[in-house]
A protein has these predicted regions:
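Surface-exposed assembly/interface segments
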Residues: 1-162
Length: 162
């Protein structure tokens, strides 16, 4: 039996511990854009999301954090998110947290459909936001994989990114 040696270095901080790769998914887009993992904002632009887009703004907010993830993923689908989540080739990728950028005015209905789909996935989480004054009734009983934010949003993108 071998002894285990542990070296503790108080000068060097531990690395960043992450919770997986956040995915910024634009639903109901005019043009689909393939799943791309990005380490910085220039890679988000290369993936097809201009600096004026909601997707870019969410990515910028994520990368501005003190303990930002090493990488994020971006993607756009012409379908609703719940439909996109039904394809195992999309859910089998390395992302873990889902942030949806939408052009749909029926946000609460979309949130309900996405919640229902994500709850069937073992290793995914959904971060959703609704306006603080939203009167939509959402069933939250038995929900384990969805985090809802109710807030007064003055921005064009999901508050959970911040």
């Amino acid at each position: 039996m071998l002894d285990v040696k542990v070296k503790i270095d108080l000068v060097k901080p531990i690395g960043r511990v992450g919770f997986g790769v956040p995915l910024i998914l634009e639903e109901n887009a005019n043009t689909a854009k393939s799943y791309t993992e990005c380490s910085n904002l220039s890679e988000v632009i290369t993936a097809g999301f201009a600096a004026t887009t909601k997707t870019y703004k969410v990515a910028s907010t994520i990368f501005m954090q003190d303990n930002a993830p090493e990488k994020i993923a971006v993607c756009a689908t012409t379908d609703p998110t719940a439909t996109w989540l039904g394809d195992v080739s999309n859910t089998g990728k390395d992302w873990r947290q889902l942030l949806v950028v939408t052009n749909d005015s029926d946000t609460a209905i979309s949130v309900s459909a996405i919640m229902a789909k994500v709850e069937t996935l073992d290793n995914k989480l959904y971060f959703a936001d609704l306006e603080a004054n939203d009167s939509t009734s959402l069933t939250v009983s038995g929900i384990n994989r969805t985090i809802l934010f109710y807030c007064n949003s003055s921005e064009d993108y999901p508050s959970p990114a911040a």
